[in-house]
Amino acid sequence: MRLAIRHISRYQFDDQATHALQRLRLRPQSGPGQTVRAWQVTIEGVEPALSYTDGLGNRIDLVRHDRGAKNEIVVVAAGVVETQDRAGILGNPEGYAPPWIFERETELTKAGDTVRELTQALPIEPHSLDALHWLMTEVHGRIAYAPNLADAPVDAETALQSGEGTSRDHAHAFIAAARALKVPARYISGYVLADSAMQRIADAKQSAAGDEPEEALALQSGDGMQQALGASHAAQSQGLPQAALGAQPQAAALMQQPAGHAWAEAYVEGLGWVGFDPFMNRCPDERYVRIAVGLDYRDAQPVTGLGASAVGVEISVVQSPELV
């Protein structure tokens, strides 16, 4: 599938700020399941002061904005990515960080009593692929979609206790539980082509939480063991049926998640890294584009910095028949 993506972020200088510094994680990289055909990050009137690859393999741009006569900063990331459905399996691509790095707890993924209660309810062997599918389904059912939560992330324990959150919180809860089971797990930020299944889940989660659905933003080869595990996993990884993409000249409305979409990946012996989207209760397929990876949201946040505050984000993901 060929996806055309456009991500526009707007910021205003803070009072008294003479300049702003930003770290951008807005460049997808080619790898298992995705090939970047064209991509550009444009910052009005500014060139990145430094671009590099961090210790987790993310492409980073560092930018300084001098206030001058302007009060707004506009950052545009756009391009075309070709994707393949690998049933969520990335395998063991060459990378910067070994799997054991992602067993480490963070403030946002620390296992408390609620996370441990979830892992203790696991009915099967904890290091199996089936256990991770069970965990994904449990997190999906325990956290209702709440698009109007504050932008500041909450930790996994709080998300499970409150029973509401966004895809970011679903990912943190899954990661915390997986790490409590001694399974390496990491946070992924990226984009997803929304479909009717995604909208139905958002509506159902809102209804279950007692909220009225709100108007969404219109944005948005291995050895024998690996092959056998992969075949079993592929049968489990299918989510709700996808709407006919050919009938969607524009992307379906993506729920109000200002930073795009988030999911998790866990390391499975014999398969390598495997993606799990507990928000959608499915494994990532050709509708997903990975942008950044981290121990949690803070490592993979699209834009961080000082001296300016976000005032608006627009994200569109559209199936494209040609390069744009």
PLM-predicted stretches and their roles:
Residues 1-117, 218-245:
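Linear, non-domain "peripheral" regions
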Residues 12, 16, 23-25, 101, ...:
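Residue-level preference for alpha-helix termini and adjacent loops
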Residues 18, 22, 31, 105-107, ...:
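Short capping/connector residues at structural and topological boundaries
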Residues 24-26, 41-43, 77, 119, ...:
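Generic structural hydrophobic/aromatic packing signal, biased to beta-strands
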Residues 71, 302-324:
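A short, charged
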Residues 81-85, 90-165, 181, 206-210, ...:
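Secondary-structure boundary elements
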Residues 137, 169-312:
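Hydrophobic/aromatic-rich core segments of domains that either
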